[in-house]
């Protein structure tokens, strides 16, 4: 066997593994809309889907625009939550959109999987409640009078349908190849933790009915939390994520804390297998790790957004730039606010 043939074979194997990453479907966010999908053939052309996701697409064509919105929601929330960290969820014009970061068993990958699974559940549920989908609507299982005395009415979010679709679509790659590998178990656990960030924070919203604003009758319905709340919950779980390893208990393979002194993780916690890189330098061999050169930093902060940590000890540039702010705002009857535009010079700091 020639060395050239061996190198070519290894390269093809690497590309196959890389392209089969379970989060590749996030590439749907790069599409302006998939609402124009009107037949099953179009599903074959959607980049980033594995074959079993293509089959789900063909059976659920009308749901795919909600999935696309979910993908964009996941990317936007990731970039918001990590805006002040060395890795800030920068995306690529390729699959996977976050690069090789999500192919490693790090806590960053754990966050991406959790927020992605949550985003599909959220977007599909919202599509159900808004009447976009023929296959689902409001949750009619919530009815009657509650123990607190109010009447269940209105449109309760059908979170059960959204979660079920997320489980079938997002989890399909891990389940199709079996659940015996440590990475498959990690991904499935974090997917479920992401969905629980919605389920465990469902809220009750109510409306009063009566004469002159009285509350003689109160009707209530169950609603999902804002997705920013979901992102905040998952980010907190990221900060406290548990490093785990695969262990066989009887005939079952399970993930357990690598440090036996740590308490076992719950279904709501994030877990990871490998330590994260420092993300300081751009690594052309690792797509998705952009480094922190040129990133803005906070000169006075001692946290991760501070120049000392963000710039990894390389120092930073400082320049004065002019910014325009609204100022001297006044309320005018009725009913608008009028502001002046004020210019001022501020110092901006960027990493070397």
From Swiss-Prot:
Gene3D superfamilies: 3.30.2460.20. Pfam families: wnt. Keywords: Developmental protein, Disulfide bond, Extracellular matrix, Glycoprotein, Lipoprotein, Secreted, Signal, Wnt signaling pathway. InterPro entries: Wnt, Wnt4, Wnt_C, Wnt_CS. The keyword Glycoprotein applies. Disulfide bonds join 78-89, 128-136, 138-155, 206-220, 208-215, 280-312, 297-307, 311-351, 327-342, 329-339, 334-335. The keyword Glycoprotein applies. Glycans are attached at residues 88, 298. CDD domains: Wnt_Wnt4. SMART domains: WNT1. Residues 1-22 form the signal peptide. GO terms for molecular function: cytokine activity; frizzled binding. Ligand for members of the frizzled family of seven transmembrane receptors. Plays an important role in embryonic development. This is Protein Wnt-4a.
